[in-house]
A protein has these predicted regions:
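N-terminal Rossmann-like FAD-binding beta1-loop-alpha1 element of flavoenzymes
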Residues: 3-29
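Conserved N-terminal/central alpha/beta ligand/cofactor-binding core
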Residues: 35-133
Length: 133
């Protein structure tokens, strides 16, 4: 078997990477157990997203604080700025987040100072990995 890319792990990061590689590539995803044992599948919480431009500075500061200011600032910027597009891409693949009257619902978790977490019931990880597979 010829393989162009080997991805170790079947969590969200590995699955998302596989889906963003060129279609002609032969991709092999390996895991030490099964998909239901991945940390991503077991994750109950949600996924943080930049709600609007007014949210940027507090999101940036919350992320730095949560990382004890050891974060790579450029990586934090990329994560925050790309979050909305990634959410839209996940939704285009069928991932469902909680909504009310057609509007996404946001909650607050961990180090976040405002509601910016999208979630699916209490099984966000299962929802995302299930749809990416």
């Amino acid at each position: 078997m010829k393989t162009d890319v080997v991805i170790v792990g079947c969590g969200v990061a590995g699955l998302y990477a596989a889906l963003n590689l060129p279609r002609e590539k032969q991709i092999l995803i390996i895991t030490k157990s099964d998909r239901k044992s991945s940390d991503s599948f077991l994750a109950q919480g949600g996924i943080c997203v930049l709600r609007d431009e007014k949210d940027y500075e507090s999101f940036f500061q919350d992320t730095l604080k949560a990382g004890h200011y050891e974060n790579n600032r450029e990586s934090v910027e990329i994560m925050i700025r790309s979050s909305r597009g990634i959410i839209e891409e996940l939704m285009s693949w069928g991932v469902e987040f909680e909504q009310k009257d057609g509007e996404l619902l946001y909650t607050r978790e961990g180090a976040h100072s405002r509601n910016r977490i999208l979630y699916h019931e209490d099984i966000t990880g299962e929802e995302i990995t299930g749809k990416l597979l």
